Amino acid sequence: NSIIRQPVITNKYVDPLLSQNGDVLYDFTGGNAIIDDYSNIAFDTSLEWRPSDDTNYQVSAGMTNGSGLFFQDLGIGYADGSTYWGQVQATMGNWYAQAFIDHNDGGKSDNPTFLYGSGFRQVAERTTIEAQIQYNFDMPWLFDSEWTVGYDYRDTDSNSDYTLWGRNEDTDDYVTNGFYGQGTLNMSDKVDLVVAGRYDQASFISAGEFAPRAALIYKASDKTTWRLAYNKALSGPSALQMYIDFP
């Protein structure tokens, strides 16, 4: 489409007929509809404090502003907007923790995000919060093993003003969290056994899932290592796959 419009929402859904007369945001008539001139700027800063050899604190923040094309199943689109983020990290002995927040305004009416195929603006505002805590420890009595255990959490709050999630807008929770652990056991001078597991729970799926992993490593020489491994990987649907409700 050579004309990009503000969609008209009816009953929490983009009305494809009324939207044909929505407010005009871009008009590429007579020119190149695919924008080929765009720019990006970024700024970030970080403050680090090390009160001791095994203690470290870090605070970081930044922002980016820019635009560009994107390609997906729905076709070619143009994204514009600003992202603001902040992160705190702490390492204290065997403990590590971090928290992160990221907010993207999804583009405003004067610099919209849109799909060329539909010709409609899409609001893609989102806020993501992440947190993680991790602990490392040794078990000398169990094959001189080294272990890592942890927990992480992620919550993505989206707002599309009904232009993308439509009738799912008010029930689009997307929260994931999981526990994980990994250990390396020194079975002999040449053989290590690595065992790991992760349990994940998602707000959009009723049951959690466990993913195990194991590897037997044989160090035949300084230049040769053999590995026999088993791994089960999990991948959930994206928020777009779960909640899209768009004509």
Short names for language-model regions:
Residues 2-33, 111-121, 163-170, 240-247:
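Solvent-exposed loop segments that connect transmembrane elements
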